[in-house]
Design a protein with these regions (language model features):
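Collagenous Gly-X-Y triple-helix signature in extracellular proteins
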Residues: 1-187
Length: 187
């Protein structure tokens, strides 16, 4: 069993039934991303691009976190993570959000692009396109190529959501073996 701090950026590990990619150690914890999308969902069922109100945010920090714990994750290992909700056009009206599990921002996509595993479909980011009420449904997304775009928040048929595992402290990590189960996976 290895400690998370012993892994290098880009290394993969299993935790709570999900395979994760280590990004970097930050303060008392480590920033990680699910190696594959965990389920298909709308960003927000009411078509709002504000992460603070997002139905996906509620699910990631509710049922999905519960599923990770049911698969053996320690709930106390998930530390609070503050996300910057600055819109693509520079508006800062939404401020920040604090979560245990969140999506990547556009800034995090760019910063960790070299070690982010490619996926077969586009994924949500939490960055709004704008905070202006006339277009408050647009949310940024990233394609498997790494190119960024935007989609309406209600769209969930093809949009898959990689969960950002906030920070983890003092975790024992087991090497990945064979086929894995993913917590919270939709049928």
């Amino acid at each position: 069993m290895k400690k998370l701090a012993e892994l290098k950026p880009g290394d993969r590990f299993m935790y709570g039934g999900v395979e994760w990619v280590k990004f970097e150690d930050i303060g008392a914890g480590t920033l990680c991303l699910a190696a594959e999308p965990v389920f298909r969902r709308a960003f927000d069922e009411e078509n709002c691009n504000d992460w603070r109100k997002s139905s996906l945010r509620r699910e990631l920090n509710g049922a999905f976190l519960d599923a990770l714990v049911a698969e053996g994750a320690d709930r106390a290992a998930f530390l609070d993570w503050e996300s910057d909700l600055t819109a693509d056009d520079g508006m800062t009206d939404y401020g920040t959000a604090v979560d245990k599990i969140a999506l990547r921002s556009d800034a995090l996509c760019r910063k960790y692009r070299e070690i982010t595993p490619p996926v077969d479909e586009w994924c949500w980011n939490l960055t709004p396109w704008t905070c202006d009420a006339s277009a408050s449904c647009g949310v940024r997304s990233v394609y498997s190529s790494g190119a960024m775009d935007w989609n309406d928040a209600y769209y969930g048929y093809m949009g898959r959501s990689p969960a950002l595992l906030s920070e983890i402290c003092n975790l024992g990590i087991y090497p990945r073996r064979g086929r894995r189960r993913r917590a919270g996976r939709a049928p």
